[in-house]
Amino acid sequence: MSIYEPPKTGKMSLIHQTLFDLRNDGVQFAVSFVDMLNVRTLSDFLIKFGTAVMKSAASTPDAYAAIARKHLADTHFVFDHVRFMTCDELISLNWDPDMNDVEKMLRLPQAIAQEKQMPYYIIFKEFQNLMKAEEYDDVFKLMERMMRDRDRSESCPVVYVMSGAMVNAMKLIFEEKRYFYRQVNHVALMPVDEKLIIEHVVKGFLNGMGKSFDRNLAMGACELFKCNLWYVNHLASICDALSKGFVTEMMMTDALSSMISVHEPRFVSIVNDLTDHQLSLLRAVLDGVVKFSASEVIEKYRLNSSANVRRVKDALKKKEVITFNEKDEPVILDPLFEYWVSNVYFEIR
């Protein structure tokens, strides 16, 4: 399973809720969360993976060492007591890893699932970072082979959930390069219904704080943030701090200004990293352009040529500023950045 959406859109909330529901239904399973935020090399990945898996299977140094001896024999993996005490690292490498090391490590969850006689869920966070390792192609192909060859009737399967916040990098893996083709189902998060968000905000203020939050103001927040619940909650929390009995439009404007002041350094860093052509194409997106290679668009926004347009689009995708939907229409990934770059940077009124 793959889940790729921008940051703070509910990926991990969905995963945690699903696991909670399974446990609530009496389903027994093991789970490991492999946080790949700082993975840059194959060694980083293998150590992160092994540490997460072993933590879910044991709880003492002797047990960790036993897992390494039993399941990772004839590899470069060792349980290093010093590394464990100083870095909380349950598995270490005594040499550069080879593909035998990779395969043995990737098979570790299945071995543990068989021992425990229960399904095993591996949750990858920021899965796209594995592409920073030079050997990513070999690793992906090995994972594909393992998924293809596994016994579908197995009572204790290993299930991989590959999540990531870099939308275009994840699309590159699953849609463009087509790794794990027909092996992984993509779960797209649907926007939370606007009516539910409005009800959540209005009732939350009334029942929780005894305050009034006008439905029209809540609707405006939903439209501004495109129903991004994290941003709506952020705005609502500031409105709560500013208000005593009821939230006014002026308070909401002040709350939005406070949010902008918090996020503006990040937004300034984004635009400072863009070239003139990239900024021009971003302006075209804000103006509602969808056909960037049209001659009048190239001339109006000084984009030089169709070939240059393709390069600029790819650059903005790589920088995770925009993505393109199934209709090949541009979408700015961060709704608050979209508001800021439109109203503050380009001063579009």
Feature map (PLM): residue ranges:
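P-loop NTPase nucleotide-binding core
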Residues: E5-T9, S13-Y121, L130-M131, Y136, ...
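Short, conserved phosphate/pyrophosphate- and ester-handling motifs at nucleotide-, phospho-/glycolipid
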Residues: M12, N228, D334
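Alpha-helical sensor/transducer elements of the RecA-like P-loop NTPase core
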Residues: S13, V159-L206
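Alpha-helical DNA-recognition elements
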Residues: D21, I238, A315-K318
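Sensor-1/coupling segment of RecA-like P-loop NTPase cores
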Residues: Q114-I123, N129-E135, V139-K177, L189
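Amphipathic alpha-helical "lid/sensor" segments that cap RecA-like P-loop NTPase cores
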Residues: I197-P265
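C-terminal leucine-rich, beta-strand-based interaction scaffolds used for sensing/assembly
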Residues: S261-R349
